[in-house]
A protein has these predicted regions:
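Conserved positions within compact, well-structured domain cores
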Residues: 1-191
Length: 191
């Protein structure tokens, strides 16, 4: 099921006391607890099947180089779909979100995920949207998979992601990367 189109009036830049503001919902979502769209890294449209064979930037045996960091470029789904200063977050910005905010696993309007609260007292909800792999969504309500705008150093086939479950947060290590063709969520940021 494809999510409903999003209206810009619903997007709120939430000040968590960090270097950037975080959007109150995922790209393609209609509410904070809505999973939103699933996107391959560097692609700006959803599809029904997420595999190496359907990835726009496949160039066997590696992927095409579209940049080491796509934040704010034509390959950034947040920037393309939302416009303005909205963009994908970087590894540095996610590290800041992880280390300078409190994280609590909750159920919000029927969706599991983390409420992330900053020093300002403001918070965002990150739904456990799962991932879109091949023709189906896997791990919804148990796992959150979110793209980071950076590729993994030394490889052009994987991009950085942050993954969470109710048992923990997994950021920034090589084991917490995904093949670029996989369909993951994107949570935008802005200055």
């Amino acid at each position: 099921k494809k999510p409903a189109a999003q209206q810009s009036a619903q997007w709120v830049a939430v000040d968590l006391g960090l270097s950037v503001k975080w959007c109150n919902m995922n790209v393609g979502a209609s509410a904070p607890e809505d999973c939103g769209g699933y996107y391959s890294w560097g692609e700006t449209k959803q599809k029904d099947y997420y595999a190496d064979s359907t990835y726009l930037y496949t160039d066997k045996p590696y992927n095409k180089n579209i940049g080491k960091n796509i934040s704010g470029t034509k390959y950034d789904v947040a920037h393309v779909k939302m416009g303005g200063d909205w963009r994908m977050p970087t590894d540095k910005e996610f590290t800041e979100l992880r280390t300078r905010c409190t994280w609590k696993w909750i159920t919000q309007n029927g969706m599991e995920g983390f409420v992330v609260t900053g020093s300002t007292g403001n918070s965002i909800f990150l739904p456990a949207a799962g991932e879109y792999f091949k023709g189906k969504v896997l791990g919804q309500r148990g796992y959150g998979y979110y793209w980071i705008a950076d590729i993994v150093d030394g490889t052009n086939t994987k991009a950085q992601s942050y993954i969470f479950t109710n048992g923990g947060l997994y950021f920034g290590s090589y084991n917490n990367t995904n093949s670029r063709f996989q369909g993951l969520s994107v949570r935008p940021v802005c200055p």
